[in-house]
């Protein structure tokens, strides 16, 4: 390889991070590494007591002046702005025959959980939502308007957490639902656990089939097991579905414009169905049960391949990847790397903890 391999790591000095978001490395040709709540402070009457001033300030922070619109039979989840901690909180409404409410935690550990409120509309009307602490103090207040039924152009989401996230992100006219037209205008959906604490509650991607112009979709730490709703999103260029229990990815074979695909930390074992993805420049199946990577021989544009912590033992298919720049294959069963010998663009190879590889 005549010095083209700048880093060949055979023993534990360099490890790539577990979360690789299908990004390109810095190369001589490409220097890019590719890959309010407004606090409402009210004027306080100077003649008032210090106690009343404190109360006014509390309510200015705790009350959302915008009315939340919901629809009968279509629960949503909203963030309540409650602090972390073990203190118990309760959610209720001014008329629970019209709408009920319940607290949901983003984590089983209350010390770190973000508390959300699920609103369950029963019949049309108006109520006030109250979130109270263990002493009965109101920490959050929200006006709720319940309308009878969703308009016909509403996206038929099956998952409350996903619907609630997209309602916040793409409901451009604040009418309480995401229309098919609105969702078709969305180009990026990025859901990390650290950015959307309810990601663990997302179980169903139904409805995303209407995101026809979606180019980037990142789903981290969800409970999704079926990616079939993504099969028609042919404009997708970057797809990350990591740390989930998906096993079947055959429906992704239609996504012929994909350039970056990250399936790290999933339960997949077979990637042979990805043969149509000839535009991929980055593929990550890190920490999966994949054992055969021969499908990559058809991915002539591939520059970055991440197969660490898999059962892969044969990398002969990589010999066809004339544009490959990086191969990360730590903790695999690889025993022969002769397939790499003629890859003139290969600059980075990581083979830490490959016990079958002779020194």
What annotation goes with each model-predicted range?
Residues 135-137, 222:
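Glycine-centered tight beta-turn/hairpin loop motif at sheet-sheet or coil-to-beta transitions
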Residues 24, 29-32, 37-38, 43-50, ...:
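Asp/Glu-rich intrinsically disordered low-complexity tracts
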Residues 1-23:
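Sec-dependent N-terminal signal peptides of Gram-positive bacterial secreted proteins and lipoproteins
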Residues 109-116:
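Aromatic sugar-binding surface patches on proteins
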Residues 188-203, 213-225, 235-246, 257-269, ...:
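Concave beta-strand-loop units of leucine-rich repeat
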Residues 131-133:
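Conserved structural position at the C-terminal beta-strand
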Residues 80-84, 121, 157, 220-221, ...:
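Non-cytosolic beta-sheet module surface loops
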């Amino acid at each position: 390889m005549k010095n083209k391999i700048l880093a060949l790591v055979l023993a534990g000095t360099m490890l790539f991070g577990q979360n690789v978001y299908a990004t390109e490395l810095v190369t001589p040709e490409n220097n890019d590494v590719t890959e309010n709540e407004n606090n409402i402070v009210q004027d306080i009457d100077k003649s008032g007591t210090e106690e009343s001033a404190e109360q006014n300030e509390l309510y200015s922070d705790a009350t959302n002046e915008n009315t939340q619109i919901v629809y009968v039979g279509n629960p949503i989840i909203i963030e309540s702005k409650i602090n972390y901690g073990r203190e118990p909180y309760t959610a209720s409404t001014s008329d629970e025959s019209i709408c009920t409410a319940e607290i949901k935690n983003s984590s089983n550990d209350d010390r770190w959980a973000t508390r959300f409120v699920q609103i369950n509309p029963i019949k049309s009307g108006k109520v006030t939502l109250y979130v109270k602490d263990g002493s009965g103090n109101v920490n959050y207040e929200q006006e709720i308007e319940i309308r009878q039924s969703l308009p016909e152009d509403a996206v038929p989401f099956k998952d409350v957490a996903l619907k609630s996230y997209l309602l916040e992100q793409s409901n451009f006219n604040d009418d309480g639902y995401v229309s098919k037209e609105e969702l078709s205008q969305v180009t990026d959906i990025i859901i990390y656990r650290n950015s959307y604490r309810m990601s663990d509650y997302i179980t169903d991607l139904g409805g995303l089939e209407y995101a026809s112009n979606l180019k980037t979709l990142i789903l981290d730490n969800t409970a999704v097991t079926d990616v079939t709703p993504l099969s028609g999103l042919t404009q997708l260029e970057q797809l990350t579905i990591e740390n989930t229990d998906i096993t079947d990815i055959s429906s992704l074979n239609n996504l012929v414009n994909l350039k970056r695909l990250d399936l790290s930390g999933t339960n997949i074992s077979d990637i042979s169905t990805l043969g149509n993805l000839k535009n991929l420049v980055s593929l990550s199946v890190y920490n999966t049960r994949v054992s055969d990577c021969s499908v990559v021989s058809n991915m002539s544009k591939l520059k970055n391949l991440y197969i660490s912590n898999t059962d892969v033992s044969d990398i002969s298919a990589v010999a066809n990847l004339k544009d490959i720049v990086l191969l990360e294959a730590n903790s695999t069963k690889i025993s022969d790397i002769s397939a790499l010998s003629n890859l003139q663009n290969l600059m980075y190879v990581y083979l830490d903890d490959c016990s079958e590889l002779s020194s």
